[in-house]
């Protein structure tokens, strides 16, 4: 049995949807490595350092969580951490096609690595970092979309 898993993402910023997936993954594994991606292809609102800081604050009450950044292939990071399970969230059918392709791509790079897909709870299904960023651009209230621990930081 696997005792740890990686939950990768840009987390720009972390949302209640992300936190929901993390909390439920904690019920399945002894340790979850939340891997904050330094993706050069994405223009982020928050720096890598800030995203790591926000994730650490948002998950500080969860003892099974370790937050790290990475800037390599996810499969290489998983090997480095001796982790065979990747966790991904699926909000809608539109997420499924992309996530399935990525899961297969990762599997083709390392046949030992499996991807587990979790759906967020219904109340979090519409939340995305993109929605949060759009609201933030117009100084809107995002307090119901993000973890309480980071409200003051945004």
Swiss-Prot record:
Keywords: ATP-binding, Coenzyme A biosynthesis, Cytoplasm, Magnesium, Nucleotide-binding, Nucleotidyltransferase, Transferase. ATP binds at residues 10-11, 18, 89-91, 99, 124-130. Disulfide bonds: none annotated. It is found in: Cytoplasm. Pathway: Cofactor biosynthesis; coenzyme A biosynthesis; CoA from (R)-pantothenate: step 4/5. GO terms for cellular component: cytoplasm. Substrate binds at residues 10, 42, 74, 88. Signal peptide: none annotated. Pfam families: CTP_transf_like (PF01467). The record marks 18 as: Transition state stabilizer. GO terms for biological process: coenzyme A biosynthetic process. It catalyses: (R)-4'-phosphopantetheine + ATP + H(+) = 3'-dephospho-CoA + diphosphate. Reversibly transfers an adenylyl group from ATP to 4'-phosphopantetheine, yielding dephospho-CoA (dPCoA) and pyrophosphate. Homohexamer. This is Phosphopantetheine adenylyltransferase. It comes from Nautilia profundicola (strain ATCC BAA-1463 / DSM 18972 / AmH).
